[in-house]
């Protein structure tokens, strides 16, 4: 299958592109800028473009059998001093369905959107969060295009565990250093609450399953392990060799401020994915502990001082 992975230089997109390539698909990554030399997808073909500015053309997409959309922006990507309503419109609520419509008009037959779980699990969160509402609109807007000629579906995953060299490794560098016990000025607690977590490898497997067997118009709530934030922090500490216990406090934390907890500090978003959907998509469960250990290894390797 000839597949275009939009957002293919990001953490989720890069893992997905490599997974699809390794299983035999002909993969191209779409990116706004140049691909770094140390990127996991540096050896893959690149299509330059920006879906938020509608720079892709029908001719760009015509060669592809399928598109994986893994470029969705979240609260970490919201720039300062921007019109938030306009940002989410371009990045999510209008931008994603418009890109899906372009893919459909180009003759692409399969489209898998990597979305987010908030609106799927707790629809009422869209009433209080512009981000969640935008994710919902992007999900529903793209799936509304489904018909006999265009199999479009959405995967709605939880918090994803993974890293690649570059921005994501740098984002986790200080957190891994703290987990190892090297940042005494950062408190050893986690905020109250928790959520579901999933490895990026499991998500990539689910994308592959959705490309092969996803139902037109379907939205799949995917996930793996329900963890408190303290349990997730503890996995990081254990993987980094920090040799201490992380307590739960009803206080914000530098690595998980209240702005990052969409459901609100102290609340838990826990669920079990539907077993039939898990089997259909064919992704691995029980992979979070391994993924945290891998994250620590990747971050350390990518951020180590040059010899």
Feature-to-residue mapping (PLM):
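N-terminal Rossmann NAD(P)H-binding glycine-rich loop of SDR-like oxidoreductase domains
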Residues: 3-23
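Glycine/proline-rich active-site loop of Rossmann-fold NAD(P)-dependent oxidoreductases
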Residues: 162-175, 210-220
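Conserved beta-loop-beta element that borders a ligand/cofactor-binding pocket
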Residues: 115, 142-167
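SDR active-site strand-loop-helix element
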Residues: 6, 30, 70, 111-117, ...
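A conserved pocket-lining segment of Rossmann-fold NAD(P)-dependent short-chain dehydrogenase/reductase
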Residues: 175-198
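Conserved Rossmann-fold NAD(P)-dependent oxidoreductase catalytic core, especially the SDR/UDP-sugar
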Residues: 85-134, 153
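NAD(P)H-binding glycine-rich loop region in Rossmannoid oxidoreductase-like domains
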Residues: 44-94, 120-122
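Mid/C-terminal beta-alpha module of Rossmann-like enzyme folds, strongest
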Residues: 193-194, 200-263, 279-307
